[in-house]
């Protein structure tokens, strides 16, 4: 299909049904601004909070946080469309309204699913794209699902001999942590939706009396909750990138510092600190010894491979007195103007347009189907 013209046509898909809808929009705005127009013909597709797909004008300025207001895709943002799950119509974006319904609005070569959270980063849209035979940026169905679910991420990491923090999983119907588990976890603990991100629904619990409210807050976003032991250590991150030839590389290390910054003493990198109030210091590169940085890069690639990831990921660590501990794997990390993933690659000598081009080229080279 790419022979149709000299530029690869990329559908940037954003928004979605998860509580991370707004952050997906912001990430998409940054990507739309930085995809090389000499190489890529870009189509912007928004997904509303209730799941409707619309062809939008893709203006980055409409996808920014402005005066604390979060962006959102609405049905009025553009023309309603669908992507048929039919390899015979590969890459066609078909009009649903207005008439004539069924008109092909655009045909794309590859999809860049800039979707964070459930119904996007969890293998669901990846499965649709596999059915439709359309190449896509990022992890496949298995790695997306495993990376989204903190319980199964940890299971796979442990199976590969990688260090993870202690935790307890609360499935639907279970509303508390036993006395033995409390003794084992200690305080503080962090209570999180098991399948969520951007610190939405996350609470720091420093007294067990606070636990029921924290579980309730997490369950507003996911019926499955994970309670993680607080880990004393520095918060470090590393980007992983796969190239079209299958080579996998790890970026310069970054560090997030919250405790003591602008009066914050709890060290909690929450949603507001990430996106609204400039309440964290982001150090890229992190001030760590070379041997520590090398070890974290090795562990990041091992974690990437442990969940059978493809394309890209950001791996989050705690650096403790006993060494690094893997916290999470993000198979579609944030791409906002302050996001660590593009900043770490920029510090590694890979600028933003080059980074995005590598991701798209890798997706096209990989294709779809069993591999």
Curated annotation (Swiss-Prot):
Residues annotated to bind ATP: 182-237
Domain ATP-grasp intervals: 154-361
Pathway(s) the chain acts in: Cell wall biogenesis; peptidoglycan biosynthesis
InterPro entries documented for this protein: ATP-grasp, ATP_grasp_subdomain_1, D-Ala_lig_Van_CS, D_ala_D_ala, Dala_Dala_lig_C, Dala_Dala_lig_N, PreATP-grasp_dom_sf
PROSITE patterns: ATP_GRASP, DALA_DALA_LIGASE_1, DALA_DALA_LIGASE_2
Protein family (similarity comment): Belongs to the D-alanine--D-alanine ligase family.
Binding site for Mg(2+) 1: 316, 328
Assigned GO CC terms: cytosol
Record NCBIfam families: D_ala_D_alaTIGR (TIGR01205), PRK01372.1 (NF002378), PRK01966.1-4 (NF002528)
Assigned keywords, A-Z: ATP-binding, Cell shape, Cell wall biogenesis/degradation, Cytoplasm, Ligase, Magnesium, Manganese, Metal-binding, Nucleotide-binding, Peptidoglycan synthesis
Listed transmembrane segments: none
Cofactors that this protein relies on: Mg(2+); Mn(2+)
Annotated gene: ddl
Cofactor binding note from Swiss-Prot or TrEMBL: Binds 2 magnesium or manganese ions per subunit.
Organism: Mycobacterium sp. (strain JLS)
Taxonomy of the source species: Bacteria, Bacillati, Actinomycetota, Actinomycetes, Mycobacteriales
Top EC class of this enzyme: ligase
Principal location class: cytoplasm
GO biological process: cell wall organization; peptidoglycan biosynthetic process; regulation of cell shape
Protein name, entry field: D-alanine--D-alanine ligase
Reaction equation(s) it catalyzes: 2 D-alanine + ATP = D-alanyl-D-alanine + ADP + phosphate + H(+)
One term of GO molecular function: ATP binding
Residues binding Mg(2+) 2: 328, 330
Location of this chain's protein in the cell: Cytoplasm
